């Protein structure tokens, strides 16, 4: 892809997300979502391959359908309340349709079937954008309309997402599909708390973005797309393998890593609101995700292929120095649990 085209598409992604974040009118928020969708499609089809073209078409159809429902629900709400402000949805039907449309955009179950298939068919860096950057704009709309959402509908979407996100990843061997199902489960955690404690959803999103970006960047650096390809990664790059292990455990929510913080705070808020059965179901569903994270770690560290290298380390000489964000992202995604009181105070 031409550097000029790449620059234009990257700027369009930034513009679309920014428009949605700062807009207080439904039309400009919808325009931002559309710019986001149209900007990422050329990046998804950068290797001109039938699989990537198929994934881009699937993504476009789902996003176009969701955008159509968003626009229709905004017009329907305006026709009954004479309000175009994003934070004001007083019509029950419009709120229901808006929730369904945003669930489609985020990949919440039962509208999640496109997420693993699209992620598997595109390159790793495009998959990283799909599972991270493209979540920001829809969640910002969720945040703005959180007082008008239907709690029962959100509970159904959240529980279904956390359960199916865990079950779907159990029999996967492709790392991109595993991260896609992980994204579905994490979106369920964010959706369940959006009405009760919206600021906690933003905290969860930031930590999820840091962990997922770290995983994708390390996998892209090591050219790993399957679980069995990680078996030889320890001999090629031990630091990358350590980063993958820490990040996966953090995504699974194990203490004392950063990923434990949002799950702990969400369960605490649910218990405070007497939603103990819901908190138990979410906690149990986390075990499904933790199982396939541990399966990756087991396959990559405890079942390594015999090393034919006689030295303790394979030395790799680089002709130029590069500044990588991976160390910083690793610290954010793994070592921020002691900062929990600070985040509670700020939120």
From Swiss-Prot:
It is an enzyme of class 7 (translocase). Its EC number is 7.1.1.2. It is found in: Mitochondrion inner membrane. Disulfide bonds: none annotated. GO terms for molecular function: NADH dehydrogenase (ubiquinone) activity. Keywords: Electron transport, Membrane, Mitochondrion, Mitochondrion inner membrane, NAD, Respiratory chain, Translocase, Transmembrane, Transmembrane helix, Transport, Ubiquinone. GO terms for biological process: mitochondrial electron transport, NADH to ubiquinone. It catalyses: a ubiquinone + NADH + 5 H(+)(in) = a ubiquinol + NAD(+) + 4 H(+)(out). The chain crosses the membrane at residues 2-22, 25-45, 56-76, 96-116, 122-142, 149-169, 178-197, 202-219, 241-261, 278-298, 326-346. It holds the Pfam family Proton_antipo_M. Its main location: mitochondrion. One of its GO terms (cellular component) is mitochondrial inner membrane. It is a multi-pass membrane protein. Core subunit of the mitochondrial membrane respiratory chain NADH dehydrogenase (Complex I) that is believed to belong to the minimal assembly required for catalysis. Complex I functions in the transfer of electrons from NADH to the respiratory chain. The immediate electron acceptor for the enzyme is believed to be ubiquinone. Belongs to the complex I subunit 2 family. This is NADH-ubiquinone oxidoreductase chain 2. It comes from Didelphis virginiana (North American opossum). The lineage of its organism: Eukaryota, Metazoa, Chordata, Craniata, Vertebrata. The gene is MT-ND2.
């Amino acid at each position: 892809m031409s550097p000029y085209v790449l620059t234009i598409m990257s700027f369009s992604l930034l513009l679309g997300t920014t428009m949605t974040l700062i807009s207080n009118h439904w039309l400009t928020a919808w325009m931002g979502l559309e710019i986001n969708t149209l900007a990422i499609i050329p990046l998804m089809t950068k290797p001109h391959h039938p699989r990537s073209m198929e994934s881009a078409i699937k993504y476009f159809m789902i996003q176009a359908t969701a955008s159509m429902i968003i626009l229709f629900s905004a017009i329907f709400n305006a026709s009954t309340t004479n309000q175009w402000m994003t934070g004001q949805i007083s019509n029950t039907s419009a709120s229901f349709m808006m929730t369904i449309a945003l669930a489609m955009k985020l990949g919440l179950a039962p509208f999640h079937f496109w997420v693993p298939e699209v992620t598997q068919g595109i390159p790793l860096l495009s998959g990283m954008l799909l599972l991270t950057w493209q979540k920001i704009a829809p969640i910002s709309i969720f945040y703005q309309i959180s007082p008008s959402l239907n709690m029962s509908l959100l509970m159904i979407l959240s529980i279904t997402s956390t359960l199916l996100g865990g079950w779907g990843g159990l029999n996967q061997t492709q790392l991109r599909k595993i991260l896609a199902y992980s994204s579905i489960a994490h979106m369920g955690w964010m959706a369940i708390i959006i009405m009760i404690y919206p600021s906690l959803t933003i905290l969860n999103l930031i930590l999820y973005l840091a962990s997922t970006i770290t995983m994708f960047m390390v996998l892209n650096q090591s050219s790993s797309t399957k679980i069995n390809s990680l078996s030889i990664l320890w001999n090629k790059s031990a630091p990358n393998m350590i980063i993958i292990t820490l990040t996966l455990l953090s995504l699974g929510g194990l203490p004392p890593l950063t990923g434990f913080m949002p799950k702990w705070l969400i369960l605490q808020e649910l218990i405070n609101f007497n939603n103990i059965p819901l908190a138990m179901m979410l906690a149990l569903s986390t075990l499904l995700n933790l199982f396939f994270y541990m399966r990756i770690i087991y396959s990559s560290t405890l079942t390594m292929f015999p090393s034919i290298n006689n030295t303790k380390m394979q030395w790799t000489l680089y002709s130029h120095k590069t500044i990588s964000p991976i160390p910083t992202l690793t610290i954010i995604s793994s070592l921020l649990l002691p900062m929990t009181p600070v985040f509670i105070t700020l939120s």
